[in-house]
Amino acid sequence: PSMRTPEYEQMAPEELRARVEAMMDERAKALPFVFLKLPSCVIGPQDEVVLPYDVEKPDWELELGVVIGKRAHRISPEEAMDHVAGFAVVNDVTARELIFRRDGSAIGADWLSGKSFPTFLPFGPMIVPKEQIADPYALNLKLSVNGKTYQDESTADMMVSIERQVAYLASRVVLEPGDLICTGSPYGNGSAFGVFLKPGDVMEGTITGLGTQRNPCVAEAR
């Protein structure tokens, strides 16, 4: 059978870049996609991440954490920062292959299974008050595994702003003091490289002005 050449292959680099930028702009305008991660996932910045024995593709996702300081419901993006207490380093560890059901269920993604294993949310080392962060959109996020850097990006490239994320969540639920919002991970997850966590690995994640976390990975006892 004849095969049609994909349209993007016929574009000049400038055209392709413009097309990709337009697609990303449209995606940024869409409603944020949100899931819940259980409090039982949270561990400290030096604690061990336990890799479940039945998970094949444990992955990392370094993110800027936003800690709520004042109750929020039905607020505007312009009001959102008034409800933020501070910022922290978070690593949204994920069982990558469990997100989408292997049985082909029409229900779709299984975020609980993929995200909420114990120890799957290294947090800290501290919560930095928002007043001490001059510009939350000028922070560098960097994550390495065994000394090799995989993520090295800026919050300037955040697709959905902190204000929009807080306001959107507050339009759906009541945000209470102490609630944590993980604002999304930049490029460089293990799945992008076909590299996944294994026992003995050490993740080191840092965000400008928020400190560094260093979490060794260990196998779950059977």
Where are these regions (language model features)?
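Active-site microenvironments in enzyme catalytic cores
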Residues: 1-146, 153, 160, 218
